[in-house]
């Protein structure tokens, strides 16, 4: 096991290139199951979630070859292999195997998925959609069993706007007989990315990016090449880091329209931001003003940037209030930030951050992916050295994070943990 060490106080300057979108990758790879021939996805991030999904595709009989950031999947010999245990439980997005395998084979067995614990994140809307399409869904010994004689198009209203349910129902519906309409659908860029792949494979999908998606089922889908979109959450994380500790930072390979809510909030804080087609220029030359944020479904402020933004607010004048309406339990980073001298209160469903304060280096633990990003930004700001454990969470979603921050001027490195440190970490 490794730990991450950061010597705070070094300004960030230079250019960083954003990787392919994690939240697209975890759906694009299972979507390849639906094709009858090879699918190549270009620009995938080199992160552990992608490795896990590649292994799962091989478990069900697929052939997966990797060439740098490009992966080619041969689905011709895939079978409806049950996946009740093992790697399927390592990440939450393995639930996309439900929709893809149901769409391809009319049956699937998938262990209840894992990933970051963020409080109650039920998959009831996914199941509602599968049942509407004609599947029988049961929960047996910690695995979801899906069976259907045939899938037929249906009108499905999502009770809550859900990215996962929207994508999963799309995957199951593209080969169903007739038309499927998803109402109150999510609008995230990653959904558009998945729909673009499916359309390139021969699917008939309209309305993606709006709250009503219409899918006319087709009998078969073919292989194709697809280039993934840039990761707006990674781009947002570096934008927040640049606002916190940057002089002049250029973020390359980004779609600024995907980050309008964050850019607006950073400008409210007096951060200088200039946009071009694929780049953001960020400079901090004035004291930060505090702001309030409320996470919302896209195009609102992303829940995945709430935790990194908390660290930024510790440097702003006066108090800022953060309310996460998507995952209210996303608060495990707060105790760790308090260890670093942050002044944070939790009242009801809101987090109140007071500043500016000088953060202090400390030993802290990342409890989930975006909590890890929050602690890294705090480490860049802190006086002294910050030690961060729980890197398995961080490596799930940030490609070459140590190298990218080092190239911007951060003093950041990894070290192997001793046996004693591992024992202490397990008791934290």
Curated annotation (Swiss-Prot):
Looking at the keywords, is DNA-binding present?
Answer: no
InterPro entries assigned to the protein according to its UniProt record, in alphabetical order: Enolpyruvate_Tfrase_dom, Enolpyruvate_Tfrase_sf, MurA_subfamily, RNA3'P_cycl/enolpyr_Trfase_a/b, UDP_GlcNAc_COvinyl_MurA
Q: Does the keyword Transcription regulation apply?
A: no
Instruction: List its EC numbers.
Output: 2.5.1.7
Q: Which residues carry this modification: 2-(S-cysteinyl)pyruvic acid O-phosphothioketal?
A: 116
Q: Which GO terms describe its molecular function?
A: UDP-N-acetylglucosamine 1-carboxyvinyltransferase activity
Q: Which reaction does it catalyse?
A: phosphoenolpyruvate + UDP-N-acetyl-alpha-D-glucosamine = UDP-N-acetyl-3-O-(1-carboxyvinyl)-alpha-D-glucosamine + phosphate
> So, what pathway does this thing act in?
Cell wall biogenesis; peptidoglycan biosynthesis
Where is UDP-N-acetyl-alpha-D-glucosamine bound in this sequence? 92, 121-125, 304, 326
Q: Where in the cell is it found?
A: Cytoplasm
Q: Which domain of life is it from?
A: Bacteria
> Where does the chain bind phosphoenolpyruvate?
22-23
Root EC class: transferase
User: What residues form the catalytic site here?
Assistant: 116 (proton donor)
Q: What does this protein do?
A: Cell wall formation. Adds enolpyruvyl to UDP-N-acetylglucosamine.
Q: What is this protein called?
A: UDP-N-acetylglucosamine 1-carboxyvinyltransferase 2
Its gene?
murA2
């Amino acid at each position: 096991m490794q730990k991450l060490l950061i010597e705070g106080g070094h300004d960030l300057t230079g250019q960083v290139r954003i990787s392919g979108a994690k939240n697209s990758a975890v759906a694009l790879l299972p979507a390849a199951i639906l094709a009858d021939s090879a699918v190549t996805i270009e620009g995938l991030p080199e992160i552990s979630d992608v490795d896990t999904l590649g292994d799962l595709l091989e478990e069900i009989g697929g052939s997966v070859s990797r060439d740098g950031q490009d992966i080619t999947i041969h689905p011709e010999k895939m079978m409806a292999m049950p996946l009740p245990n093992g790697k399927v439980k390592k990440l939450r997005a393995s639930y996309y195997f439900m929709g893809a395998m149901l769409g391809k084979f009319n049956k699937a067995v998938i262990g209840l998925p894992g990933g970051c614990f963020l409080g109650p994140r039920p998959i009831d809307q996914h199941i509602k959609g599968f049942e509407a399409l004609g599947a029988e869904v049961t929960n047996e010994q910690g695995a979801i069993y899906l069976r259907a004689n045939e899938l037929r198009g249906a009108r499905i209203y999502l009770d809550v706007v859900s990215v996962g349910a929207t994508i999963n129902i799309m995957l199951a519906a593209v080969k169903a007989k007739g038309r499927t309409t998803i109402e109150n659908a999510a609008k995230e860029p990653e959904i558009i990315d998945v729909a673009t792949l499916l359309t390139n494979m021969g699917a008939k999908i309209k309305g993606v990016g709006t709250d009503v998606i219409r899918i006319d089922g087709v009998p078969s889908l073919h292989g194709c090449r697809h280039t993934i979109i840039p990761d707006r959450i990674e781009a947002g994380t570096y934008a927040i880091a640049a606002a916190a500790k940057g002089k002049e930072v250029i973020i390359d390979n980004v779609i600024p329209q995907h980050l309008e809510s964050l850019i607006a909030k950073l400008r409210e804080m007096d951060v200088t931001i200039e946009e071009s087609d694929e780049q953001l220029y960020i400079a901090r030359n004035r004291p930060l003003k505090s702001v309030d944020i409320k996470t919302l479904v896209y195009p609102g402020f992303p829940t995945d940037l709430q935790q990194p933004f908390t660290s930024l607010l510790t440097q702003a004048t006066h108090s800022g209030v953060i309310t996460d309406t998507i995952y209210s339990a996303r608060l495990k980073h707060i105790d760790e930030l308090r260890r670093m001298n942050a002044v944070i209160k939790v009242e009801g469903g809101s987090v109140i951050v007071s500043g500016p304060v000088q953060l202090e280096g400390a030993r802290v633990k990342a409890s989930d992916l975006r909590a890890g990003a929050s602690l890294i930004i705090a480490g860049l700001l802190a006086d002294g050295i910050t030690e961060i454990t729980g890197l398995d969470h961080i490596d799930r979603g940030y490609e070459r994070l140590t190298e990218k921050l080092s190239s911007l001027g951060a003093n950041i490195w990894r070290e192997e943990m001793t046996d004693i440190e591992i024992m202490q970490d397990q008791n934290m």
